[in-house]
Amino acid sequence: MKKIITLGLAASVSLSAQEAILDLTKLHSYADQEVPDYINRDNTPGNNPITDIGATLGRVLFYDKKLSKNSTVSCASCHKQEEAFGDSAIASVGVAGTTGRHSMRLINARFANERRFFWDERAPSLEAQTTQPIQDHIEMGFSGADGDPDLSALVDRVSQIELYQVLFTAVFGSEGVTEARMQRALAQFVRSIQSFDSKYDRGFASTPNPNADFSNFTAQENLGKRIFTAPPGPGGGAGCAACHQPPTFDIDPNSGHNGVTGSIGGGQDLTNRRSPSLRDVVDHNGSPHGPFMHDGSMATLLDVVNHYNAI
């Protein structure tokens, strides 16, 4: 039983076997998280700023398996918090099989010049992206094709849940559930997922020049940073920063195909031009939050470096 306490209104809603309390008068601070001064890229649209209550609704939706056809898969099933909101599996498991591409990490999705989403950039915004997996036959099953119910069936399902009646009213002023409202809430939560506590951030804070050596880096780490940042050429670097732009390490919107042409299901996949941020590619022990690339074909960062060295 999950309990809701909101502005004097108490409601009990059965969502899981776990006991939890959500007090809408004491929300987690999503809107006012500290962002370093040197982070100046933000794809948040003016009509959907992050709010504490909006991101709270988005978080509940993100973790709710009832958003899938058979109530077995949530957004978090493929975008796992412990994997930088990505997946350790090459292909994620949906309601009707495995996905055709590796699940992209969501860390720092907000802090980027690129506004399009998915590996092939088919979604024009994060808002538009959030409900496409829900409407995918394999992923969450509200496709409206191949015998699946369509999204209106999910809207009806969510509308009947008392928890969502309370939350949608708190966010939007009425309990009406629509795709657009779900998109806005989910996008607010995803944009609230941020990471700026790395060794790089500590170095940049004391030496605010991405091309200078950082005093907290080892000699090898500073060499790696120079190789990453410097353009290719005699005595130059690898030019990684031309596409993965410091200090956010988001993908340049003008980046082309990266030369990885494989597909999880076999054959070629030539439409991929996007990348997640390179932040949180490993955990605090140095283990990769991988595998990497849209086809999950590279298990280690050394595999990635060797790929680019060969093309």
What spans do the regions from the language model cover?
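C-terminal capping alpha-helices of c-type cytochrome domains
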Residues: L151-A170, S174-D197, S297-I311
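Short, flexible active-site loop motifs that bind/organize anionic cofactors or intermediates
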Residues: N48, G144, L154, F172, ...
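Short coil/turn segments at secondary-structure boundaries
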Residues: D120, M140-D146, V166-F172, A180-R181, ...
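Short glycine/threonine-rich turn/loop motifs
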Residues: E19-Q132, K199-A310
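Hydrophobic h-region of N-terminal signal peptides that target proteins for export
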Residues: A10-A17
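Sec-dependent signal peptide recognition
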Residues: M1-L7
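Glycine/proline-centered hinge or cleavage motifs at structural transition points of membrane proteins
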Residues: A109-R110, R116-Q160
